[in-house]
């Protein structure tokens, strides 16, 4: 665990969209294949064994994710008799979407635990003993997890971790013993087990991050039997389609509209679109997509100013947004302007708007509509 500076919000790879400035102004390298011998065999007299493959996967896979996962540890490479270990395939270790998931999880953990001076740098190295997971659950659930005093013995660590994992499973509504992220796997620093548990926790607590959709991890499972390493491959689902970011709470009209009223929802969107354009047209701007055009905060800042009867100077916010951080700053500025008008605190969160959560965006616009619909 490190106590260095906090991580910045990770940015997502997004296609560059045209800004509104013009309108406002005036209108890992792969190894070479071994040569074949005269019998068609590669690499000399012996074929690569399963154990060689496991060793190579451990070295190359971890190297590919070395910005957020621990360096290779010699004790993880060599299997004891009967031992089972899981390794990411080289292709999975180089998957940019998986790297995004790791970065987003680290960002979320550091944001949540900043007040406890905890900074996560490597998911496996920092979380395998369960202490950080315990701190996270205690904060978010406002509970105290009764665990034995800190033990230096491996068995003591496992017992403590077992209690923490069982608590997480109870909160998530999972079986008491969930084999996908068992205490044994997490204590082994199994990447897939740790990340699957963290993703479910992030979704359960509506973390203000949006994961890439449908990320999978291809995993090699290695087991040593009678002195020989046998392997097989499995695929583990890391993320699916993330439908909502907003925190859990009392259901409102928008929850009902999204669940049961697609026709009425379309009508509400049409009304909000007309409301926004009625005011944005005053400065030759127009919105066509409520779902996406407010997430960078530009239209939101300008709209709040127009509703209050003033034009927000362009140097007060980022007009041509280049990064996720600039989106967040713009939306934060818009929230500050709304607060200054005496508007009630929005249920939507800044990060939810910047991440493009549709329900949160519509809730916020409806809040403005309710106050300013007669202007």
Curated annotation (Swiss-Prot):
Keywords: Actin-binding, Cell adhesion, Cell projection, Cytoplasm, Cytoskeleton, Repeat. Expressed from 1.5 stage embryos, mostly within the muscle cells. In adult hermaphrodites, expressed in the attachments of other muscles, including the uterine, anal depressor, anal sphincter, and vulval muscles, as well as in the spermatheca and the distal tip cells. Expressed in mechanosensory receptor neurons ALML/R, PLML/R, AVM, and PVM. Localizes at body wall muscle attachments. Residues 10-20 have a biased composition (Basic and acidic residues). One of its GO terms (biological process) is substrate adhesion-dependent cell spreading. The keyword Cytoplasm applies. It is found in: Cytoplasm, Cytoskeleton; Cytoplasm, Myofibril, Sarcomere, M line; Perikaryon; Cell projection, Axon. Signal peptide: none annotated. The calponin-homology (CH) domains are essential for its function during attachment assembly and the interaction with pat-4. May interact (via calponin-homology (CH) 2 domain) with pat-4 (via kinase domain). May form a complex with unc-112 and pat-4. Component of an integrin containing attachment complex, composed of at least pat-2, pat-3, pat-4, pat-6, unc-52, unc-97 and unc-112. This is Paralyzed arrest at two-fold protein 6. It comes from Caenorhabditis elegans. The gene is pat-6.
């Amino acid at each position: 665990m490190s106590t260095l500076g906090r991580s910045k919000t990770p940015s997502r790879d997004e296609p560059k969209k045209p800004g509104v400035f013009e309108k406002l102004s005036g209108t890992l390298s792969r190894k070479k294949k071994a040569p074949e011998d005269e019998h068609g065999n590669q690499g000399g007299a012996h074929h690569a064994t399963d154990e060689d493959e496991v060793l190579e996967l451990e070295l190359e896979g971890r190297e590919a994710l070395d910005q957020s996962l621990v360096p290779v540890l010699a004790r993880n490479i060599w299997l004891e008799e009967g031992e089972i270990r899981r390794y990411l395939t080289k292709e999975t270790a180089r998957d940019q979407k998986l790297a995004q998931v790791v970065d987003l999880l680290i960002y979320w953990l550091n944001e949540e635990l900043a007040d406890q001076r905890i900074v996560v740098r490597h998911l496996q190295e920092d979380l395998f003993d369960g202490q950080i997971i315990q701190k996270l659950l205690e904060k978010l659930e406002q509970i105290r997890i009764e665990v034995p005093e800190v033990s230096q013995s491996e068995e003591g660590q496992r017992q403590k971790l077992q209690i923490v994992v069982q608590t997480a499973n109870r909160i998530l509504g999972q079986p008491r013993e969930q084999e996908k992220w068992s205490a044994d796997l997490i204590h082994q620093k199994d990447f897939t087990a740790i990340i699957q548990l963290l993703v479910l926790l992030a979704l359960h607590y509506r973390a203000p991050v949006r994961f890439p959709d449908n990320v999978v991890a291809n995993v090699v499972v290695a087991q040593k039997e009678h002195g020989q390493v046998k392997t097989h491959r499995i695929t583990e689902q890391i993320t699916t389609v993330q439908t909502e970011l907003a925190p859990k709470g009392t259901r409102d009209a928008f929850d009902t509209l999204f669940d049961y009223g697609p026709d009425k929802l379309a009508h509400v969107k049409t009304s909000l679109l007309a409301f926004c354009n009625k005011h944005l047209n005053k400065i030759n701007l127009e919105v066509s997509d409520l779902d996406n055009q407010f997430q960078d905060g530009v239209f939101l800042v300008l709209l709040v100013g127009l509703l209050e009867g003033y034009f927000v100077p362009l140097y007060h916010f980022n007009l041509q947004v280049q990064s996720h951080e600039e989106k967040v700053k713009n939306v934060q500025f818009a929230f500050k302007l709304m607060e200054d008008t005496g508007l009630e605190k929005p249920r939507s969160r800044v990060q939810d708007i910047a991440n493009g959560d549709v329900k949160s965006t519509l809730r916020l616009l409806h809040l403005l509509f309710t106050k300013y619909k007669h202007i």
